[in-house]
Amino acid sequence: MKNIAILGDSLIGLLSALILSKNKNNIYIFRNAQEDSERENIERYFSINLLSKYMFMKSGIWENIESNGIQPYKKIITWNDTGNEVTFNSRSISYDYLGYIIKESSIKKAIEEKLSKLENITIKSIEEVSCIDQSENNVINFINKKKLKYDLLLLADTRNFNVFNNLEINRITHDYNQSALVINLKLENSISEKIAFQRFADNQIQGLLPISSNEFNLIWSVNSSEVDNLFNKDKVLLTKILNDQLSSRIGNIIKISDRIVFPLSGFYVKSYVYNNIILIGGSAHSVHPLAGLGLNMGIQDIFILDTALNHEKNTYINEKSLNYYNNNCIKNNKKLFYTINFLKKFYENELLALSIKSKALDFFNKSLILKSQVIEEATGIKMLNSVLSEGYSRPNNY
């Protein structure tokens, strides 16, 4: 049996624990310090792609999540104010859906219920840790002077970097100079077809995720200098602004929720492995939310790690398996990082003539091959089919 420590109880940390527990390892989860109570009281939604669904099914939590309500969608429609439109359809890759909108609380509850039934899971608080020093040969030091020797340590949250004495992480960063305003919108009428929308306008991006038959979750990315103005507007005025921008697509908005704001920044690490310490999920990368891939990228990290370790069943954790994880995470996440940044810059570039943008978007929208390739990347189908010999199919629960 191996000792695996996971710093951070984010969704990525918890799902990592569940996936890695299957080989009867001793799993130690170190919960983060309590978060801001205001953020805790606001429900978050995620767009889950097909690779993430596969991992939820493999870990045996999909049926639990599904029973608490999900919103599948078949189409994504993007448009800008000059009239250009691009439509992505699940038919392009011969699947029923492109993704699923799921509450964060539903995912977390399903994982925690599964973990609570496992005897090889130990929950601790990160506040119990005094320091972790690589020179001490894979040991976690506790405030009470006790020690825990680990075979593998997963760092799943950037908030926990401070417990390391000598861990230097090299990162490539990108300042988007934007913040995201998150609001739930209630419509006057129901929409029969579940579609995710995205509107590109001057220095702003509005992503709309269907969360019920007459509600959308709006992620509104705007320049940081403008976000306070929007945040402080009264609900009546803000509803009018949103109706002017969005009602032609989703219908009349009659009510909006309270709103939250969070800053946007991008980064990726140059290496995911530091001896027996590995970075995963939010500790390793952050991207603009325009593609809705943040959580999915973290779950893809777990998929790659699980694949790497299961390729080495005899020794399980060794240099070869960790190199596999490191190399594949670097290759895939770096590509996604720069692709997302390119798309953002393309839509915002005022120096690029509108006629050129229009022709490029029209060509792309008519190219079934190009769109299919993009969809396969974004949904994780390409990754699944490249690794699984049988292709993407329903895995056995365990």
Language-model features, listed with the residues they occupy:
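FAD/FMN-dependent oxidoreductases across multiple families
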Residues: D228-I317
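Glycine-rich FAD cofactor-binding loop and adjacent beta-loop-alpha segment at the N-terminus
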Residues: N3-A5, D9-Y73
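Conserved N-terminal helical subregion
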Residues: M57-K58, W62, I70-N166, H174-V182, ...
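Conserved FAD-binding catalytic core of PHBH/FMO-like flavoproteins
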Residues: F56, L152, A156-G251, S257-R259
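C-terminal helical "tail/cap" subdomain of flavin- and related membrane-associated enzymes
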Residues: T307-Y398
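Active-site flanking residues adjacent to catalytic metal/cofactor-binding acidic residues
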Residues: L7-G8, F30-R31, A156, G281-G282, ...
